[in-house]
Amino acid sequence: MAINFENAPLIEVIVELRWGAALPFPPQGLSNAPTHLFNVNLEASQHEEFFMNFGAECGSRGLQRAERIVPQGFPVIPGQVVYRFRSNDRSLQNLLQVGPGVFTVNGLPPYKGWPSFEAFMGRGIDALLASRPLNETENDFSSVNIRFINGFGKDYFEDTSRLAFLKSLGFIVQVPKELEAVSQEDNSTFFNMNYITNLKGGAKLQVTVAEGVKEGVPIQVVELGTTHESVRPTKKDLLEIINISHDLIEKIFMDMTAPIHSKMKPKEV
């Protein structure tokens, strides 16, 4: 049986696909050249056709609420989100985002579990693959990134310090003796961490620990993510990579948070 948590710390799940140019357009330092201004307009026209095709594919899948993030006529650079698409059912919070060279699936609370999110993501991937320009359909995605962003509120560390809470998750902070001798650890003591390591098979695992704020209340952010490079542009290949990443992240999260599961209020579903 799967386990969900009534007091889950999850803030957002993000699956991001990238392709094409990795550098902003136009090139740095050449913005005054008339030829590059023309290129920007031409590029924008090509992007708009892709956006319209993607929007039509989303609409046919029940995602007809569109929101443009970048105003019409403004320059758009590779990797910048331009449109968001949501379900007609306003009770569903998940959304798709698209821009030149970037596509994301965003899962927001109330998170109904991976199978539900995976089904929504599959619809988004179908829409993306059906709307890619013909000259790009065989090109690999340069990267596939999945991130689980968790925010632990003060109810998780109200009886202890932030550092003690992080230690309960397995994060051990070791500072030089000179700093330890003059410091006084209390609720104002914190640390930020960005840990990146390689995984078997060539992917990367990233763990980020940082302070954050949610609805005006301080939280402890713990983000787990993976990145795979050069992924074949098929739904089968994409879902396989994403599911492998999900399973790894879920195992790390469940093992890491085992000491505080009682506060997360687990329930079988």
Where are these regions (language model features)?
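Short, flexible loop/turn elements at secondary-structure junctions
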Residues: 19, 109, 148-152
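Solvent-exposed, flexible loop/coil segments flanking beta-strands in beta-rich domains
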Residues: 1-3, 149, 267-268
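Surface-exposed beta-loop interaction hotspot
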Residues: 114-118, 122-153
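Aromatic/basic-lined ligand-recognition segments
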Residues: 79-91, 95, 140-226
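Conserved aromatic-histidine-acidic binding/catalytic patches
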Residues: 3, 105, 109-116, 233, ...
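Hydrophobic alpha-helical segments and helix pairs
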Residues: 85-129
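N-terminal low-complexity, intrinsically disordered segments
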Residues: 1-98
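Long, compositionally biased interface segments
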Residues: 217-269
